[in-house]
Amino acid sequence: MIEQTRDITTAAGEMETFICCPERGGPFPPVFLLMDAPGIREELRDMARRLGTVGYYVLLPNLYYRAGRDTMFGPNVLEEGSAERERMRVVRTKMTIPPIMDDLAAMLAFTDGRAR
């Protein structure tokens, strides 16, 4: 299995993206695995790996990249009233559908341009 982190160029900057796929064979159909509110974490990387092992080219983008590279939250991010939850809420509320659609268009362009 190939695992790598690549920057995908978007209209807003470089979007850090975890990518995995099988080492041999192909072509591999792309799968865009979008994070939920708590953001990128090992559980999502594991899901991407599982999809990669069965023949997909999986892209897991950090959709919070506009808030800073490697934007991550602590383990209590889902606990009501926690500081991490409030920090996540502030970042999340700045995300709207149009920029996310632009990010997806950039991901499509990236997958179209990759070696088959």
What residue ranges belong to the model's regions?
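N-terminal cap/leader regions of alpha/beta-hydrolase-fold enzymes
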Residues: M1-R116
